[in-house]
């Protein structure tokens, strides 16, 4: 497979959206403690996360080895967190089961109402890519609305990006090695299910 495969910067996967009502999932998540995502492009507790599947048993174990000065040991194994057995998570398993691949980290990422994530890339995670065994990052909005805007830029030199509004229950590939930003102009916290998927041809076929 050619290394420099031409791929979109954002694409809705060729999967039927998850249409059952998942508002109960959002309400359940709103009551949980989230952990701050430490970055240079957000402030305070604006951007937070919890882990559903990762490198520790606790939902606040959101990091992986060798990323963001993580204290996670390199020998740490992937595992489900304590959210695994919660009844509210049943729709999440149904959503994830539609993705034809193995998963690395699976997190819920929250952007508070009225807050922004500044322009950045996710290149700090060296595993992200498109070839077999690399990480393809898939976003599935769980709680959002039309006033949440995701902006992607083709090049670091671009001053103006393309704006997207991602819909609840839809599956989106985002090339997070490209500059991107998010602004939540609504009065509701935005929560995305973010699945880091091990790339394979079947998954790529849903994107290309």
Outline where the language-model segments fall.
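Catalytic phosphate/metal-binding cores of nucleic-acid and nucleotide-processing enzymes, i.e., regions
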Residues: 5, 130, 161, 201-202
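A short hydrophobic beta-strand segment most commonly corresponding to one strand
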Residues: 136-141, 171-174, 187-205
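Short, conserved beta-strand element in jelly-roll/cupin
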Residues: 110-111, 130-148
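A short secondary-structure junction signal
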Residues: 118-122, 129, 149-154, 185, ...
């Amino acid at each position: 497979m050619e290394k420099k495969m031409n791929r979109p910067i954002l694409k809705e996967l060729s999967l039927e959206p998850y249409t059952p009502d998942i508002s109960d999932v959002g309400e359940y998540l709103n009551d949980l403690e989230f952990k701050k995502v430490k970055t240079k492009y957000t402030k305070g507790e604006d951007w937070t996360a919890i882990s559903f599947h990762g490198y520790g048993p606790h939902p606040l174990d959101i990091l992986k080895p060798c990323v963001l000065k993580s204290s996670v040991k390199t020998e740490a194994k992937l595992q489900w967190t304590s959210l695994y057995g919660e009844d509210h998570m049943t729709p999440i398993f149904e959503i994830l089961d539609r993705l034809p691949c193995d998963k690395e980290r699976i997190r819920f990422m929250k952007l508070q109402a009225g807050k922004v994530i500044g322009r950045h890339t996710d290149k700090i995670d060296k595993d992200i890519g498109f070839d077999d065994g690399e990480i393809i990052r898939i976003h599935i909005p769980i709680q959002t609305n039309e006033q949440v805007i995701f902006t992607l830029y083709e090049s670091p030199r671009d001053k103006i990006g393309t704006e997207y509004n991602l819909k609840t229950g839809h599956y989106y590939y985002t090339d997070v090695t490209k500059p991107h930003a998010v602004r939540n102009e609504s009065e509701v916290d935005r929560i995305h299910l973010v699945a880091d998927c091990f790339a394979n041809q079947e998954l790529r076929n849903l994107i290309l």
